[in-house]
Amino acid sequence: MDAIKKKMQAMKIEKDNAMDRADAAEEKARQQQERVEKLEEELRDTQKKMMQVENELDKAQEELTGANAQLEEKEKKVQEAEAEVAALNRRIQLLEEDFERAEERLIIATEKLGEASQTADESERVRKVMENRSLQDEERVYQLEAQLKEAQLLAEEADRKYDEVARKLAMVEADLERAEERAEAGENKIVELEEELRVVGNNLKSLEVSEEKALQREDSYEEQIRLLTQRLKEAETRAEFAERSVQKLQKEVDRLEDELVHEKEKYKAISEELDQTFQELSGY
């Protein structure tokens, strides 16, 4: 009987131990289940976050693509402005060459005027000494008149040439104004591009990337932004250089206009002197 009681007690103890182990196993299973659910929830959150990051990165890529297109357009406009400046330089050079040729003609006309004046003085002296040789004097006067007419024709030709130079200068001024307007538009566009790139940079900096691949892509985008910013600065520098070139050309045009006015005044004085000489010779 005692053996049976001991055996029953042992079985009860074993049963209690088994129940305790079962409860412990059940608790452990419950904890494992909670851990699995928590991990699944974290995984879902991570997946959502990754999808959000991917969407934001795609949006940033689109913005960078747009910025690249705008930058290429700006560089194209800067190249066009530089080409216009080069064309203006060539036109200024041609105008200077025309101006030099006109100056040479002016010198020739002035020399002929001096010769005509000297000839007129000589004719006056001969007329006083040899009043009886009227026929020879008259022939001499005709020669002087022909020389004076030739000098007047040269002066008129030079005047027409200077009028042509003035028209060309007016065209150059119009071209310069258009180039200045394009340079100003280019500067405004650069400011807009810089603002857009600043917004893109701020958006990229606000992204929270948790995976190594996303971090690498963000670094790549930041490098692209840095390169774009550098290219924008270069384009801005080129635009400023183009503007300075336009200002320099404007000063050169102003100088040529002043010289043109001065030379016209000289031609006017020569023409008046030629007319006066012609009248004096006609009086003889």
Curated annotation (Swiss-Prot):
- The parts of the chain that form a coiled coil are 1-284
The record ties this protein, via PROSITE patterns, to:
TROPOMYOSIN (PS00326)
Region annotated Disordered sits at 1-47
Keyword Protein transport appears in the UniProt entry = no
Per UniProt, which keywords does this protein have?
A: Coiled coil, Repeat
Chain intervals with Basic and acidic residues compositional bias = 12-38
Q: Which family does it belong to?
A: Belongs to the tropomyosin family.
- Protein's job: Tropomyosin, in association with the troponin complex, plays a central role in the calcium dependent regulation of muscle contraction.
**Swiss-Prot/TrEMBL domain comment:** The molecule is in a coiled coil structure that is formed by 2 polypeptide chains. The sequence exhibits a prominent seven-residues periodicity.
Q: What name goes with this protein?
A: Tropomyosin
